[in-house]
């Protein structure tokens, strides 16, 4: 018993020493016991045409406000914010300091941008959530990526939108875009009042999409999971859906429709906007 306890103490000592070495002069923060820290950075919005954010294991929260500058603030235990400006690009890098991330308290990077900002925004998070509260923002190119965390964007306009989630939910609400590429490897996706040319690819997880307007084509490719679509009554669409293993059902009032167990073709209005749905394993419901 004494030998076991001794070995455990030795291992603990080694880990603590490693944690101190990892943090250099910052001292002991192996278990997140250092003082609460927060850092801020300001940039003049008129000098910036792209905001590039890289966060390792920290939640990123983007907020649009009536302001002239861009303000980034990071808070939490054992966190660090690096920033630079070059060629019109503001780069923000947020990461946790310490040895094992599962000992850290919740950390967050809040970036406040002017409501009149109209350029590019790119966010990449390793294992944190990404939240974009657009507040009516009208941006050019928006790219959101999360490895292990949820992605949420609302009240946003973007000419080009890219959303990539590896493990976690994806949720878009009140988003207008010319073209959007939405991909999820493992997790559920929910769209509500999203317009534009949409391409949705999902490996594993359920998709639920509710549209009040369809003004361009919609492509859905899903490997494993169920799909549920709610379409507007006045849609001008032609729809084709097929499932290799699963059922396809509908309660939508198509003008023309042919529905079998695993296929569905339907037309509403002049069939202007095309909807293609391809499911390998899962059910499809259209209402």
Predicted regions and their residues:
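A short, Trp-centered hydrophobic/proline-enriched beta-strand micro-motif
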Residues: 52-54
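Hydrophobic membrane-insertion alpha-helices, especially the h-region
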Residues: 7-23
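Short, surface-exposed interaction patches in beta-rich subdomains
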Residues: 154-155, 161, 170-287
């Amino acid at each position: 018993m004494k030998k076991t306890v001794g070995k455990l103490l030795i291992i603990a000592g080694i880990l603590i020493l490693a944690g101190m070495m990892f943090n250099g002069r910052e001292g002991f923060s192996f278990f997140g016991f250092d003082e609460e820290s927060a850092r801020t950075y300001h940039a003049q919005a008129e000098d910036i045409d792209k905001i590039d954010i890289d966060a390792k294991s920290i939640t990123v929260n983007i907020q649009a406000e009536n302001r002239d500058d861009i303000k980034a603030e990071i808070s939490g235990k054992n966190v660090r914010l690096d920033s630079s400006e070059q060629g019109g690009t503001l780069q923000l890098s947020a990461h946790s300091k310490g040895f094992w991330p599962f000992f850290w308290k919740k950390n967050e990077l809040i970036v406040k941008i002017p409501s009149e900002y109209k350029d590019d925004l790119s966010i990449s998070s390793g294992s944190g959530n990404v939240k974009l509260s657009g507040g009516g923002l009208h941006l050019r190119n928006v790219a959101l990526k999360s490895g292990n965390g949820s992605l949420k964007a609302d009240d946003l306009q973007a000419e080009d939108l890219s959303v990539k989630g590896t493990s976690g939910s994806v949720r878009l609400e009140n988003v207008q875009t010319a073209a959007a590429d939405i991909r999820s490897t493992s997790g559920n996706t929910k769209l509500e009042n999203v317009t534009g040319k949409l391409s949705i690819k999902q490996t594993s997880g359920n998709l639920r999409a509710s549209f009040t307007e369809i003004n361009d084509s919609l492509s859905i490719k899903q490997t494993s999971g169920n799909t549920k679509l709610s379409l507007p009554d006045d849609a001008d669409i032609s729809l084709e859906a097929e499932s290799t293993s699963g059922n396809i059902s509908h309660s939508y009032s198509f003008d023309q429709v042919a529905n079998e167990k695993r296929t569905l073709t339907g037309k509403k209005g002049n069939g202007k906007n095309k909807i293609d749905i391809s499911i390998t394993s899962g059910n499809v419901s259209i209402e």
